[in-house]
UniProtKB/Swiss-Prot annotation:
GO CC field: chromosome
Protein's recorded name: DNA topoisomerase 1
Classification via PROSITE patterns: TOPO_IA_1 (PS00396), TOPO_IA_2 (PS52039), TOPRIM (PS50880)
Cofactor: Mg(2+)
Zn finger (C4-type) location: 589-621, 649-676, 699-724
Domain annotation Toprim: ranges: 3-136
Positions that bind Mg(2+): 9, 105
Catalytic residues as annotated in Swiss-Prot or TrEMBL: 313 (o-(5'-phospho-dna)-tyrosine intermediate)
Gene: topA
This enzyme's EC code(s): 5.6.2.1
CDD domains: TOP1Ac (cd00186)
Catalysed conversion reaction: ATP-independent breakage of single-stranded DNA, followed by passage and rejoining
MF-aspect GO terms: DNA binding; DNA topoisomerase type I (single strand cut, ATP-independent) activity; zinc ion binding
Organism: Buchnera aphidicola subsp. Schizaphis graminum (strain Sg)
């Protein structure tokens, strides 16, 4: 018993840390969380005693949630599926060592993982040590092991309080939403406020009424034939504003014979400070804007960079930089850019209103490493972005000259503003300056200019823009909703739930999301109240700081939520939650001649036969008609705007959503549906911008027709055969995806993290191995070529070429199957010690071509 056990969350992190620790340390990974709250699915039914006593509703709910709010928040945990082997191994090693170092991440989640590991491993509590570090470097690791501590239980309590609240809301409100609105719905303490941001913006956009106005620019010439362009800004000392073409023509008549004299010119020198080093939220925004990465992808790549020791810890909202980091970056700037770019003192940035962590900002672990090798190309781009912001944050400000020139023509004032960059400063690294070195002619005050051209411009006011991932993150941060470390999870959840649709990287609220938020505003106002959500985050932070008792906070939240829940369960006429009713229409059902009604579900808006609910189960008519939303068609902004302008509900005067029923019929539905039953039908011949929307294709499995559908993950075709239900996705370019093969069992290839075996699946990023017990075990990996070659007889014909690929590179490293997203092509690459070697092979002209980087 001379060695010590060190436990971290990820295998990559374990591998990196083991390089800096001596042989007396055994470094192992827990592969993330090992325990979670128990639920019905995770209970071992063999251990549940049979009873004739029917559980009452409260008891059943407690069993489902795994927590008991009526008994001082007693919680029941279970080992996560697939983690049994890992826990068994950790326990075995723990019994043979003197000390156990819990080196999980330094945030609340990491603290909770450390506590769960301690509880699961058990044994003498004096053996456990807590070590934390902000970066995975030799110096940082050595310092951490010289300053060992204990698990911070206040941080654990804060994480548990957040987890318990989320579990309460999710488990207690979902049955109500399923009953009152639609199956598959859920609400969340933070996610519902995020959905409200998108639905409120959707409402603003749809009800926006544009206003026309005009501005006039003038092209002027000096006697030396020097040309300048200026805007009319004032008329009789009032802001110049024209509302229509008539006013424009009148103004042109007034100014075309006037004299234009320069009356003022002001030159000022300004400085533009560099942006702060990146924190979690600004990393997500910058990555989305500059690199086009989703928030989820950004956090995934950043986590890998941290675990490999390239950057500091990624979950932080502090702009603080250590003295060591500042000293190194200032030295780098002076050596590589010169002393002109180095400020006399380091740049200091103040933290934000809701800042809670005392960590450093995100920065490179070693500023001398400008580019990294043996990494995913996207990870390299993200590292370079982080490096650029870090360097720029400690450089001198950009200096530029602002030139403001004023010209008078009788009662008209004209102005122009020009910026000339004098010193690039930090923009040498981050080229974010929009300043243009346009030199305004040096003309003296009193100079007379000659009118050359009159340039009128028609302008329309614009509605607020739709949220992108970056702007949604910025708004969440601004309102204090959630924490930056949770933004990726929030956005992923609301995407998966079908509360929004994404078109050209912009968020469109789905109808079911609008209905959900309308109902929550009335019956669960706290869940969608921005200020309440922000205050709760602040309270959870105070739990970490031991300023608030976590159970008192939970009791207060639970009491209030329970009262709202009981009220919402009542009938609508007694103040309960409104139902998601079907709105009758005059459209006849093609199967039973009853009328069709407008129905909204998670899958979208559609027409459903009213005979479905009016008849006994065996006689129900299940006929439905899919409605194709205007937003799902490739219409122009002008077309979309015109639809909303021209069609308003005759019952409530709100705008109407437009759907295509078929090539000869459109339906306009009030945006307040189903609360308002207003709708209009329009007959005609309608051209489709989305060419495949009404296209008929045959199912490759059963040869029946496939119909266009709209779902929470986008548009697709679905087989009309109920026993088949085959689907084909519609790609962003409008094309229909190629048919995918059925999962192929590989019982001889076993999983590493669970007692099961792999199946070969085909996804949007090519083929991959996945555990056959998915979703119980979510283990996945890329297939080795030698595995495909060994079991070639199991593969469909279209994959046989992969089995013929080189099984090893020129240095003997095994090759795996990869996917090029740009070219939508499978290729072969090799790895050594978990990193790509740069060797690759592509299948071109029916043969494998090897590429060495």
């Amino acid at each position: 018993m001379c060695k010590s056990l060190v436990i971290v969350e990820s295998p990559v992190k374990a591998k990196t840390i083991s390089k800096y620790l001596g042989k007396q340390y055994i470094v192992k990974s827990s592969v993330g969380h090992v325990r979670d709250l128990i639920n019905n699915k995770s209970k071992n039914k063999k251990n549940i005693k049979k009873s004739n006593i029917k559980h009452n509703e409260k008891t059943a709910l407690i069993q489902q949630m795994g927590i008991n709010p009526y008994k001082n928040w007693k919680a029941e945990y279970h080992i996560l599926p697939g983690k049994e082997k890992i826990i068994s191994e950790l326990k075995n090693i723990a019994n043979k060592v003197h000390y156990i170092y819990l080196a999980t991440d330094l945030d609340r989640e990491g603290e909770a993982i450390a506590w769960h590991l301690k509880e699961v491993i058990g044994g003498n509590s004096l053996k456990f040590r807590r070590v934390v570090f902000n970066e995975i470097t030799k110096k940082s690791i050595e310092k951490a092991f010289q300053n060992i501590g204990k698990i911070n239980m206040n941080r654990v309590y804060s994480q548990q309080a957040r987890r318990f609240m989320d579990r309460i809301v999710g488990y207690m409100i979902s049955p109500l939403l399923w009953k009152k609105i639609s199956r598959g719905l859920s609400a969340g303490r933070v996610q519902s406020a995020a959905v409200r941001l998108i639905t409120d913006r959707e409402y603003e956009i749809k009800n926006f009424i544009e206003r026309e106005h005009w501005k006039i620019s003038l092209s002027l010439l000096s006697k030396e034939n020097k040309k300048v362009t200026m805007d009319i800004t004032h008329y009789r000392n009032k802001t110049f504003l024209l509302n229509n073409k008539k006013e424009v023509n009148s103004t042109i008549e007034k100014i075309k014979n006037l004299s234009f004299i320069i009356t003022d010119r002001k030159d000022k020198i300004f400085k533009k400070k560099p942006p702060a080093p990146l924190i979690t939220s600004t990393l997500q925004q910058a990555s989305n804007i500059d690199l086009g990465f989703s928030v989820k992808k950004t956090m995934f790549l950043a986590q890998k960079l941290y675990e490999q020791g390239y950057i500091t810890y990624i979950r932080t909202d502090s702009y603080f930089l250590s003295n060591y980091a500042i000293e190194k970056v200032r030295s780098y700037i002076e050596n590589f850019y010169g002393s002109d770019f180095l400020p006399k003192k380091s740049n200091i940035y103040s933290n934000q209103k809701y800042s809670q962590e005392a960590h450093e900002a995100i920065r490179p672990s070693d500023v001398q490493v400008v580019n990294i090798d043996n990494c995913d190309p996207d990870a390299k781009k993200l590292y370079k972005l982080i490096w650029n912001y870090f360097i720029a944050s400690q450089m001198k400000s950009e200096r530029y000259k602002s030139i403001k020139t004023t010209v008078m023509a009788d009662v008209f004032k004209l102005q122009s503003n020009t910026k000339i960059v004098l010193f690039s400063g930090w923009t040498k690294i981050l080229k974010k300056s929009n300043n243009v070195n346009f030199k305004f002619p040096v003309l003296d005050i009193g100079t007379t200019l000659i009118l050359d051209k009159i340039l009128p411009h028609q302008i329309f006011t614009k509605p607020p823009p739709r949220f992108s991932e970056s702007s949604l993150v910025r708004e969440l941060e601004k309102k204090g909703i959630g924490r930056p470390s949770t933004y990726a999870t929030i956005i992923t959840k609301i995407k998966e739930k079908g509360y929004l649709k994404i078109k050209k990287n912009k968020f469109y609220a789905a109808k079911i999301g609008e209905i959900l938020i309308t109902r929550l505003k009335k019956n669960f106002s706290d869940l969608v109240d921005y200020d309440f959500t922000a205050r709760m985050e602040k309270n959870l932070d105070q739990v970490s700081d031991k300023l608030i008792n976590w159970k008192h906070l939970l009791n207060s939240f639970f009491d209030n939520f329970s009262q709202q829940l009981e009220q919402a369960k009542k009938p609508p006429e007694e103040g309960g939650m409104e139902l998601n009713t079907t709105v009758p229409t005059e459209i006849d059902c093609s199967l039973c001649n009853k009328k069709m009604g407008i129905k909204t579900a998670v899958t979208g808006v559609f027409l459903s036969c009213l005979g479905y609910n009016s008849e006994p189960n065996e006689k129900r008519c299940k006929n439905t008609i899919n409605l194709i939303s205007l937003n799902d068609l490739s219409t122009t902004k002008k077309e979309e705007k015109n639809f909303h302008l021209k069609n308003r509900c005759k019952k409530c005067n709100l705008v109407m959503d437009v759907y295509l029923i078929n090539e000869n019929l459109k339906i306009f539905i009030c945006i307040n549906n189903p609360s308002c039953n207003g709708y209009n039908l329009k007959k005609g011949i309608f051209k489709k911008s989305l060419n495949c929307s009404l296209k008929k294709i045959k199912c490759e499995k059963c040869k029946n027709d496939m119909l266009f559908k709209t779902g929470r993950f986008g548009n697709f075709f679905m087989c009309i055969n109920d026993t088949c239900k085959n689907t084909r996705k519609i790609l962003p370019n409008g094309e229909i995806s190629e048919p995918k093969f059925e999962p192929i069992p590989f019982p001889d290839i076993l999983c590493e993290k669970s007692n099961t075996w792999f199946v070969l699946r085909e996804g949007i990023s090519g083929i991959f191995f996945a555990a056959n017990t998915f979703p119980k075990s979510r283990e996945t990996r890329s297939p080795f070529v030698e595995e495909l070659a060994r079991f070639e007889y199991l593969l469909p014909k279209k994959l046989h070429y992969l089995a013929s690929a080189p099984q090893r590179d020129n240095k003997g490293n095994k090759t795996i199957v990869c996917f090029n997203k740009l070219n939508k092509q499978q290729y072969i690459a090799s790895k050594k010690e978990g990193k790509f070697t740069g060797w690759a092979a592509f299948f071109i002209d029916r043969k494998w071509c090897i590429v060495n980087k």
